[in-house]
Amino acid sequence: MTTTQQPNLFLTKIIFEPQLVENENFGVVTDIDPIVDGHYLFYSKKWLPSIADCDTAQASTFLHNLFARTVDVPYAYFERGRASFCTSMNGVLHAHGHLVPVFSADMAQLFPYGTIERCFNLEEAYRLVETQGQYLLWGNLGGEFYVIQNVEELPKRTIRNTIRAQQHL
């Protein structure tokens, strides 16, 4: 018995949106529901459940080189990978992360939901991500990153709500 994979509606739509920057593997577009001014969505052009399932060295290089040279201010990066809640566009999972202008130099305690693993950079953080299960990854591009494994119980909009709350401090 053969099964036919349905088209990824997220990718089918987002690749036709105006791209801030892109290459053959990744793209960055303006988030359609921005948390703050300058909120972008970083996505994989391959249909994968998380950025950690991509070539993470390429993802890190893209963000640090191509994206960082395109914007005028430092940015922070957030991803909740392999999250079943990430089901916009009729239940299709898609690998993506959120990029927002840096709002805090010390991001270590931003998400106090479990054991936080501290990393020197984004690429090291992705190497820590386990091959199964949801994770929360965040940090300032060019700075330290943090990972929490097994975050299946976190509320759906944890990243958005936390960033929004930080903007009002």
Language model regions located:
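HIT superfamily nucleotide-processing domains
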Residues: 1-169
